[in-house]
């Protein structure tokens, strides 16, 4: 019987505080396999990059790839943070210096309809004893955000039959590297028993000892580098898979060295320093945010309206995590204030639907004020206050006014907000009744920075 080890990481999201221990663990396992003349594979399942971290922001993810090169992964795929959190040009060059293969079967250039040059749909690795392991990868499809970024993202169910059929006959063990989420993984397992192993990610689910669906082994290792997946495949002399032993190893149990903390802090310091070199504007007054102080929010609402070329904007105060003080403004200050990978959306609604949307917002206002938001691009703590520019709501008469005038139910109105408002479940009118246009490639912090630059030039 041959033993093949497969180690997998996923959804690190630039949580580099766990990286020294993860690297040490992976290196140790690879050394052990080499000494025992065993085959070992290492893969990453995407969302290794997340621009909340200043070093990731400052290098457009290139620093993350440098870290991945320390491992020498056999294969990686991308998550939505690489795919949508990068401009098309940034993603096209993210892996220029990578020493590993990027696998991805459902992303194509929107203009040429060809696969990106930095990716391939699959890879076959032959073990020391001749077992052929086929790896292929799929990432979560978000057409609303991939398309305006220049990509044609396709749904896995449309591609899986051909991908599975083309690979199954060539390999002994078939492995799907999935950045699709637990629900999709289970559906795929139920439909494609030809797949032997699905390595899961995206929804941050954790299988300490795996899960079996329709004879397909599922594995998943949580989020933020809190676990590393460790799988041992047992194959017979005919290279048939007989058993898969799955476990998730807690990073907290891994060896920690005294110098680890200095390395972790070094990543932050390097990121801050690089961002501080990039000056944006020279502002004459503080842009604060807090109780009764809305100057930073007002400046951002103005910037949003300028970028979208509209007269009305809506945003929430929980986005603003730090003030921007008077004097020279750099990209580090913008990033600390607005670390979220959020884009703007331009929304058009009939007047009747706009009134309903504002009523939804007012109904949820007190609930959302201190409501903790997790995910969907949000990197803060609570949602906060809903802030309008150009809209007014009369709480006594429940009337909504647009630029001081009553709203006409049959007329069309266009405003700008952040895409987060569309993704969270509190304002369904935006998605159900609205015509939404995503404004790429800038994040909200870049929109604010561009506005400050235009209004407050550096002498």
Locate the predicted segments by residue.
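Feature captures C-terminal
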Residues: 325-459
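Acidic, metal/ion-coordinating pockets
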Residues: 1-250, 292-298, 303
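Structural signal for hydrophobic packing residues in well-ordered secondary-structure cores
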Residues: 26-33, 99, 164, 168-171, ...
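C-terminal extensions
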Residues: 191-194, 198-205, 309, 314-353
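A broadly conserved detector of short glycine/acidic/proline-rich loop/turn motifs that flank catalytic sites
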Residues: 137-140, 222-224, 237, 318, ...
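Residues in well-ordered beta-strands of folded domains
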Residues: 103, 219, 315, 392, ...
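A short C-terminal boundary segment appended to hydrolase-like catalytic domains
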Residues: 237-329, 452-459
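Active-site proximal loops enriched in glycine and acidic residues that flank catalytic Cys/His/Asp
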Residues: 8-10, 202, 316-318, 348, ...
């Amino acid at each position: 019987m041959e033993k093949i080890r497969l180690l997998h990481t996923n959804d690190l999201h630039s949580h580099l505080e766990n990286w020294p221990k993860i690297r040490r663990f992976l290196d140790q396992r690879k050394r052990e396999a080499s000494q025992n003349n065993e085959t070992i594979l290492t893969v990453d399942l995407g969302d290794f990059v997340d621009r909340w971290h200043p070093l990731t922001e400052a290098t457009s993810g290139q620093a993350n790839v440098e870290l991945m090169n320390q491992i020498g992964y056999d294969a990686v795929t991308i998550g939505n943070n690489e795919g949508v959190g990068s401009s098309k040009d940034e993603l096209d060059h993210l892996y220029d210096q990578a020493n590993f293969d990027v696998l991805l079967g459902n992303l194509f250039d929107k203009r040429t309809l060809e696969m990106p040059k930095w990716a391939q749909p699959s890879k076959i690795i032959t073990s020391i004893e001749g077992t052929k392991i086929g790896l292929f990868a799929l990432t979560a499809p978000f057409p609303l955000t991939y398309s305006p970024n220049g990509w044609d993202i396709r749904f896995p169910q449309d591609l899986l039959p051909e991908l599975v059929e083309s690979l199954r006959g060539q390999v002994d063990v078939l492995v799907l590297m999935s950045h699709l989420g637990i629900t999709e993984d289970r559906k795929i397992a139920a439909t494609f028993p030809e797949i032997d192993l699905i390595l899961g990610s995206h929804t941050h689910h954790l299988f300490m000892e795996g899960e079996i669906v329709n004879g397909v082994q599922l594995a998943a290792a949580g989020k933020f580098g809190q676990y590393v997946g460790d799988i041992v495949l047992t194959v017979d002399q005919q290279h048939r898979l007989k058993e898969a032993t799955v476990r998730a190893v807690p990073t907290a149990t891994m060896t920690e060295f005294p110098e680890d903390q200095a390395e972790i802090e070094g990543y932050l310091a390097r990121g801050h320093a690089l961002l501080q070199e990039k000056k944006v504007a020279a502002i004459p007054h503080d842009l604060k945010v807090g109780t009764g102080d809305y100057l930073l929010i007002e400046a951002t609402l103005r910037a949003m309206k300028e970028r979208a070329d509209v007269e009305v904007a809506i945003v929430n105060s929980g986005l603003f995590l730090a003030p921007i003080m008077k004097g020279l403004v750099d990209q580090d200050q913008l990033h600390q204030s607005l670390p979220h990978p959020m884009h703007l959306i331009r929304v058009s609604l009939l007047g009747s639907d706009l009134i309903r949307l504002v009523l939804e917002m007012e109904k949820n206002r007190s609930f959302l004020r201190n409501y903790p938001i997790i995910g969907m691009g949000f990197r803060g703590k609570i949602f906060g206050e809903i802030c309008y520019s150009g809209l007014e709501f009369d709480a006594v008469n429940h009337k909504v006014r647009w630029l001081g005038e009553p709203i006409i139910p049959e007329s069309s109105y266009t405003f700008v907000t952040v895409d987060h408002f569309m993704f969270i479940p509190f304002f369904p009118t935006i998605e159900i009744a609205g015509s939404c246009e995503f404004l790429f490639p800038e994040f909200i912090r870049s929109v604010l920075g561009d506005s400050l630059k235009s209004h407050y030039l550096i002498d």
